[in-house]
Amino acid sequence: MAMLSTASVSGSVDLPRGTMKVDSSASPEVVSDLPPSSPKGSPDRHDPSTSSPSPSRGGDNQSEVISKSEEYRQLFRLPADEILVQDFNCACQESILMQGHMYLFIHYICFYSNIFGYETKKIIPFAEISCVKRAKTAGIFPNAIEILAGGKKYFFASFLSRDEAFKLIHDGWLEYGSAVKSEGEILVTEPQVSDGVVKRARSSMDLANELDIPVRDETLHLSSSSSLPVISQNGVPPSSVQRHAEPDVDVVAANTFNWKPEDTDAPKLSSDFTKVAEAKFSIPVEEFFRLFFSDGAVSFVESFHKNCGDKEFRCTSWQPHEKLGHTRNVSFQHPIKIYFGAKFGGCQESQKFRMYRNSHLVIETSQEISDVPYADYFTVEGVWDLKRDCRDSVEGCILDVYVNVAFSKRTVWKGKIVQSTLEECREAYAHWIRMAHELLKQKKLENQEGNKLIEDGEPLAAREERVSECDEEGKVEMVGEGVVKKSLKEAWVNLTSFVKRQSGTRQVIVLAFAVILLMQVTIVVLLKKGGGGQVEYHERYDEYSVNGETLGWLEKRMHFLREEMMMVEDRLQRMRQDHAALKAQFHHLERLLRRNKQ
């Protein structure tokens, strides 16, 4: 794939890059009494001890660094107290893409470019910045930063280390810029304690949910008057905050939550949702919420995300909402399983719950992901449906988890996105249910031979047996593929040795014949694999158990298969065209060879 105008222009001349760096570690996620702009233990950007080179370097190197910093300061005509923090190789997007360097000073962001004698200088004070967010070059490559300052938008692309540059810019903006926050992060702020009451302000995510407006931008603006406390296991636990404050009616505490079920039945679930997990627990619905979803259960939620490979987990407290019941926000970094681009994608998840008649608890989630292909095309919606189970002597509950991938734009990859999302959700929720049962066994709230995990209407033992059978089939297939690869390798070695012994014209003919042969082999392999597609039947039924939900699932499956067949047909058509072109070229070479012989 060709890179989209991000390569540096040949002949560009830039000033030498600076080498002065500071430790720009982010503020620790701790609910404390210190302001967020100056947390305890965080480095000072203008502290000489953090902006100087390593102590192992001599005085000559230090003076050289200072002289370079002074040279850049004079280039941009900055105040005398400005110190160069770091510089990055990037490009500024205006009418054309200008390759150059970004120089980060304590109070300024500067950019310099010199292409064929055409100089460009840009100076952006941190005090004028109103918005900073990560962006994508051409909407695909996550290597750009967008800055809004003084009513003007600046777009910097082609960063080799975009996250490091964004972190430095973000820290400098929070320390020396305006009070507006960036990047959609749930920031740690000072809890305002007044008369023993912890006051919490709603975030803009809650306002967006109230108005039913999807938050598509990566930037979340919070006013300086808002304070959004965060429950984090890296900092002070939530209990330590509530020990010094009396419980407020506006705060959903872990142990003092007052259940107020609505005197209505839960709304019916849309047919767009697909069941991905089902389980039974031998505890009441209220106890289930307290152990796994309350403010006191954040440690369990964080341990689940860590086991899934997530990092930077943050979670707010439950807050009452007039229209949505109770809401909270969760954010984390999730690993991306692709070979290019970012290794982690930012996930912003809003959660809300309501208790209906007969202890029917419904928890709804809406998750948006950034830094992944087609991230702005879809949103992952989830529903945790928890019902009371009084059939046994001990009151329990039954959990059903449903997922829907809601698309806002059309794409030919919709089927693949939905399939991969559902598969990952099945694995994640199955792991969550296993962890929940282990926690109940540790607390002696469930027997060792108690509730069995059910996934997609299938017992765990049967699912494990089916997985083992699939593994054995996969091993046999891998052995067969290994034999084919070995034979192809030997054939290629023999072919190359034969070509080396031939003349120039014969080499061309032999290579063309080899290409045509490889194309035919590829077509045969693709057609052979197409018949054995990776299809999972998530529901087992007989001819008497077909219901509306099963028919809906079959219709969706047929739609996805139809899309996949269209893509395969397009690919085969292109391969036939390539094959015809190669065949025509081969005949042309044969005619040339005959003419040369005559």
From Swiss-Prot:
Keyword Transit peptide in record: yes
Domain of life: Eukaryota
SMART domains reported in the protein's UniProt record: GRAM
Occurrences of domain VASt (ranges): 272-444
Chain ranges of the GRAM domain: 70-134
Topology of this chain in the membrane: Single-pass membrane protein
Annotated localization: Membrane; Plastid, Chloroplast
Transmembrane segments: 507-527
Pfam families hit by this protein: GRAM, VASt
GO biological process: defense response to bacterium; ethylene-activated signaling pathway; negative regulation of programmed cell death; plant-type hypersensitive response; response to ethylene; response to salicylic acid
Chain positions carrying an annotated carbohydrate: 61, 329, 494
Coiled-coil regions listed in the entry: 553-595
Span of chain positions assigned to the transit peptide in the UniProt entry: 1-68
Biased composition (Polar residues): 1-11
Matches recorded under CDD domains: PH-GRAM_GRAMDC
Traits of the deletion mutant: Lesion mimic mutant with a light conditional appearance of propagative hypersensitive response (HR)-like lesions along the vascular system, and associated with expression of defense genes, production of high levels of salicylic acid (SA). Increased resistance to virulent and avirulent strains of Pseudomonas syringae pv tomato. This necrosis symptoms are ethylene-dependent and associated with ethylene accumulation.
Annotated spans, Disordered: 1-64
Induction entry: Expressed in response to pathogen infection (e.g. Pseudomonas syringae) at the vicinity of the hypersensitive lesions.
Gene Ontology CC: chloroplast; endoplasmic reticulum; extracellular region; membrane
Keyword Coiled coil in record: yes
Keywords linked to the UniProt accession: Apoptosis, Chloroplast, Coiled coil, Ethylene signaling pathway, Glycoprotein, Hypersensitive response, Membrane, Plant defense, Plastid, Transit peptide, Transmembrane, Transmembrane helix
Role, per record: Involved in ethylene- and salicylic acid-dependent cell death control associated with cells in the vicinity of vascular bundles.
Record-given protein name: Protein VASCULAR ASSOCIATED DEATH 1, chloroplastic
Taxonomy of the source species: Eukaryota, Viridiplantae, Streptophyta, Embryophyta, Tracheophyta
